[in-house]
Regions:
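Periplasmic alpha-helical coiled-coil/stalk elements that build and connect Gram-negative outer-membrane
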Residues: 9, 107-222, 326-333, 360, ...
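A glycine-/polar-enriched beta->alpha junction
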Residues: 16-26, 33-48, 72-89, 99-106, ...
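Amphipathic alpha-helical coiled-coil segments
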Residues: 27-42, 104, 108-128, 138, ...
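Small/polar, glycine/serine/threonine/aspartate-rich low-complexity segments that form flexible
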Residues: 51-91, 199-209, 253-290, 417-420
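Bacterial Sec-pathway N-terminal export signals of envelope proteins
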Residues: 3-51, 55, 91, 153, ...
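Acidic, glycine-rich loop-and-beta core segments that form the ion-binding/anion-interacting portion
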Residues: 215-261, 279
Length: 420
């Protein structure tokens, strides 16, 4: 069995493959195709339907049916006052499924992008932890030597062992998470999980949002999920209108039929005037007078429409609340990322200071001399601050992309990615 060679995959490629491979997108696409068929089915009742049949068979005695060699019938609706409402309902149903498809694509783009960025972050953290583990092993060796020499209490060795154990535990946890992210991306894109390697250069900066902007207008006009819910509710409202009109307005249909009768059945012996060719054409008018079933159906349709509007309002409110929560969290997450970056800068400066003092001395007569242990601690601290910075930056990116998803723009952001 041949194993797939590792391949670097850009974010653009991952998103594009996920949109092509997604089962939820395929389901939503099938719903759109079904809705198109429903529109055609509802509209085409005005077009005549033609049927051809035959009833050839042996008979004996008095006629019990029509000795038809073959027959042709045609029928269509001429007037149905409810039909325009049903056509409007079908078209709005199609609009709802199209919006649902776009909303599904938005979610696929968000999920794939976040998993990709998270895998890239985890990969960087694992590389930092590998370096941190080397420094921890060196620190553990130094502490062991100092304890053996009797110049350091055993508690310092225990502290170094604890630091090393925490690093190994975190690395094990992140390695397991990276495997899960690769498997998830494999399911989303169709690529082998073991060969999935991210490209950090393909991840662009996420757009910033104004803290004082009103997102409610954006949500009402751009969130496909909310728009789909209202389109579905309006579709059911038109269907309820159509059901209501069926109680009061007549139905007029067109019918035509031609029959070619056989003579070998001897039916002409029993009929005074028998002929082989027979044709009939006319209209059928059905006037509703009293139908409790249709009345109940009307009430059912009206209640269903009211329920759909209430669900659409609830979804709109929930989406607006989620957007507001994300918008308010951006300022805090941005400051947290800034704090983490400053802590990283500080740790790097402290590391440079320690290395300089170990190389040339502090230059102060009364200063406590630094040891290789201080160097390893400074290196470990710098790597930990780097990992914290990665975590803070990811949380900010996740919030921004989630907000883009809420206002219906995350797919536009994905299309702007460089095609590598």
């Amino acid at each position: 069995m041949s194993l797939a060679a590792p391949a670097q995959v850009s974010l653009y490629t991952a998103v594009d493959l996920a949109l092509r491979n997604s089962t939820s997108v395929r389901v939503a696409t099938a719903d759109v195709q079904k809705a198109v068929a429903i529109v055609n089915e509802t509209r085409d009742v005005y077009l005549p339907s033609f049927y051809v049949g035959s009833g050839i068979g042996y008979s004996y005695g008095f006629p019990v049916g029509q000795p038809s060699i073959w027959d042709m019938t045609a029928q269509s609706t001429l007037f149905n006052y409810s039909l325009p409402d049903y056509i409007r309902a079908a078209r709005l149903g199609l609009r709802s499924t199209q919006l649902t498809l776009r909303d599904t694509r938005q979610q696929v783009v968000l999920d794939t992008s976040l998993n990709y960025i998270l895998l890239n972050k985890t990969t960087d953290e694992l590389a930092a932890l590998d370096e941190e583990a080397k420094y921890s092993a060196k620190l553990l060796e130094i502490e062991q030597q100092r304890v053996d020499a009797g110049v350091e209490p055993r508690v310092e060795l225990t502290r170094a062992r604890l630091t090393d154990a925490r690093i190994r535990l975190k690395r094990l946890h992140l390695a397991d998470e990276a495997a899960v992210y690769r498997e998830t991306l494999s399911h989303q894109t169709g690529l082998p999980a073991a060969s999935f390697i991210t490209d950090s250069k393909s991840i662009p900066a996420t757009p910033e949002f104004a803290s004082g902007g009103d997102l409610n207008l954006l949500i009402a006009g751009a969130n496909q999920g909310v728009q789909s819910a209202y389109a579905a509710a309006k579709s059911k409202q038109y269907a309820a209108f159509g059901d209501n009109r069926q109680q009061y307005y007549p139905l007029i249909t067109f019918n035509a039929q031609y029959n070619r009768y056989a003579r070998f059945n001897n039916y002409d012996l029993y009929y005074k005037n028998f002929q082989s060719n027979n044709f009939g054409v006319g209209v059928q008018i059905t006037i509703p007078l009293f139908d409790m079933v249709k009345r109940a159906k009307t009430r059912e349709s009206a209640a269903d429409a009211s329920r759909s509007y209430a669900q659409a309002d609830m979804l709109r409110d929930q989406t607006e609340e989620q957007a507001l929560r994300l918008q308010k969290s951006l300022a805090e997450l941005s400051l947290q990322a800034e704090v983490a970056a400053l802590q990283l800068d500080l740790a790097q400066s402290q590391l440079e200071t320690v290395l300089a003092q170990l190389s040339t001395g502090s230059g102060q007569a009364n200063a406590t001399p630094l040891s290789p242990r201080d160097e390893q601690n400074a290196r470990i601290e710098e790597r930990q601050r780097f990992e914290d910075s990665l975590d803070a930056e990811y949380e900010l990116t996740r919030a921004r992309l989630s907000l883009l998803r809420t206002v219906g723009s995350v797919e536009d952001w994905a299309k702007s990615l460089p095609n590598r």
